[in-house]
Amino acid sequence: MFLSAALRARAAGLAAHWGKHIRNLHKTAVQNGAGGALFVHRDTPENNPETPFDFTPENYKRIEAIVKNYPEGHKAAAVLPVLDLAQRQNGWLPISAMNKVAEILQVPPMRVYEVATFYTMYNRKPVGKYHIQVCTTTPCMLRNSDSILEAIQKKLGIKVGETTPDKLFTLIEVECLGACVNAPMVQINDNYYEDLTPKDIEEIIDELKAGKIPKPGPRSGRFSCEPAGGLTSLTEPPKGPGFGVQAGL
C-alpha cells in the first residue's frame, strides 16, 4: 500500500522530467481564441462590430463561385470557405468579418460564430505575416519538437502566443498536423516544413526575414515520407490493369 522512499524518489524524478510536456486542456485552441478565451468574444478597440471590413470586388466574385458549388437554398454550407477567404484577405477574423459572412450567406451570425470558434485554424486575433505553428503532440514530442520550439523562441525573442514587434512572426503550439512520419515539423502559413533540426528552422526563419519562401517539405533529403534508407516497396511503376489476371478471364 505504501511506496518505498526509493519509489517515491523515482516517481518525483519522472514527474520533473515530463512536467514540461504536460499542457493544459485545449491550450492551442485557447491561444487562437479571442482575447485568450476559447469561446468568448469581448469587444476591443481593434475587434468589435464596428471594425471596418468588407470583401474586395475580386473576392465577391470568388464568393459567388464558391456558393455555386452548393445546392440552391444551401448557402449556409459555404461558411467554412467564405470565412477562410475573409481571413486570407484580412489576415485574421474580427467579429465584423464574421457578421459580413453571415449577411452574405443569409444565416444568423451565431451560425458563423459557432464555426469560427470551433476550428482553431481561424485566427480570432491578429497574427504576424508568418504564422509559425509548432506541433508538440506525442509523435513530434518524441522526435524532440521541444528543441524546435526553443530554437524559434531564442531566434525570434518571443514566447508561445506572442508576435514579434515588427509583426512578421507569430508563434503558437498546435495539436497533430497529420505529418507524424515527418516529425518534428511545423506549419508556416499554408506550408509544412518537416524532418526539422534546430538549425533547419533557424535557416527557414532567416529566409522568411529576407522575403523568400523556403521550399516546403522534408529537410532531411527525403522526397516525401518514404523510409530514410530508401523505398522497400513500390520500387517500380505499377503493372497496370489486368496484370496477373488469368488469360481466360
Swiss-Prot record:
UniProt-listed Enzyme Commission number(s): 7.1.1.2
Entry keyword annotation includes Ribosomal protein: no
Superkingdom, taxonomy of origin: Eukaryota
Subcellular location: Mitochondrion inner membrane
Cofactor(s) demanded: [2Fe-2S] cluster
PANTHER family: NADH DEHYDROGENASE [UBIQUINONE] FLAVOPROTEIN 2, MITOCHONDRIAL, NADH DEHYDROGENASE UBIQUINONE FLAVOPROTEIN 2, MITOCHONDRIAL
Record function comment: Core subunit of the mitochondrial membrane respiratory chain NADH dehydrogenase (Complex I) which catalyzes electron transfer from NADH through the respiratory chain, using ubiquinone as an electron acceptor. Parts of the peripheral arm of the enzyme, where the electrons from NADH are accepted by flavin mononucleotide (FMN) and then passed along a chain of iron-sulfur clusters by electron tunnelling to the final acceptor ubiquinone. Contains one iron-sulfur cluster.
Organism of provenance: Bos taurus
SUPFAM superfamilies: Thioredoxin-like
Chief location category: mitochondrion
Swiss-Prot/TrEMBL GO biological process terms: mitochondrial electron transport, NADH to ubiquinone
N6-acetyllysine modification, residue list: K61
Phosphotyrosine sites (modified residues): Y193
Topology of this chain in the membrane: Peripheral membrane protein
Summary of subunit composition and partner proteins: Core subunit of respiratory chain NADH dehydrogenase (Complex I) which is composed of 45 different subunits. This is a component of the flavoprotein-sulfur (FP) fragment of the enzyme.
TM segment ranges: none
Leading EC class: translocase
GO CC annotation terms, alphabetical: mitochondrial inner membrane; mitochondrion; respiratory chain complex I
Protein name: NADH dehydrogenase [ubiquinone] flavoprotein 2, mitochondrial
Cofactor: record remark: Binds 1 [2Fe-2S] cluster.
GO MF terms, alphabetically ordered: 2 iron, 2 sulfur cluster binding; metal ion binding; NADH dehydrogenase (ubiquinone) activity
Keyword Electron transport: yes
Residue sites binding [2Fe-2S] cluster per the record: C135, C140, C176, C180
Keywords, sorted A to Z: 2Fe-2S, Acetylation, Electron transport, Iron, Iron-sulfur, Membrane, Metal-binding, Mitochondrion, Mitochondrion inner membrane, NAD, Oxidoreductase, Phosphoprotein, Respiratory chain, Transit peptide, Translocase, Transport, Ubiquinone
Transit peptide: 1-32
Primary gene name: NDUFV2
